[in-house]
Amino acid sequence: MKWNEIMLEKIASQQGKTILITGSNTGIGFETARLLALKGADIIIACRNQEKGQQALADLRAKVPGVQASLVQLDLANLESVRQCAAEIIENHPTLDALINNAGLAMPPLQKTADDFEMQFGTNVLGCFAFTGLLMPLLVKTTGARVVWLSSVAHWRGTIDFDNLNAEKGYSSFGAYAQSKLAN
């Protein structure tokens, strides 16, 4: 029996629950969406690239016939996108039973977000925290709602350098990644 089949047996019914998963167009995020959809959850795929998101939505519908699923655009490296996506979710969904913060960025060359933050800290920490905060009123009004945050064992190697959060005094792609995972 495969790992995901074992996990499927352990997941309780999610019938009637709305679950948003960031970065769910591929990898762990997509498999999480698939397993939860098989248990009856309504899935919101949130990802940056809408073409890849549409493909993930089609794949999910093919693998889980009858699934209630939708796609929203979310670029965690752009706080305006974060605000727009949260507003769209709040406007279109009366409840949100779970937010799974899965999206993240790992070890790119030094880059900045649209808001001029170091890319990994801006995406993995600031974008995710802003998104969660903006959705908190909807989560709070949903009985039993949960927020799940994926991280990495790389956090063990991280330190929070408050004097260099924006990588202006030097940059190590792994150091910045580990710092962002520790901050999660």
Language-model features, listed with the residues they occupy:
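Rossmann-fold NAD(P)H-dependent dehydrogenase/reductase core
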Residues: 2-184
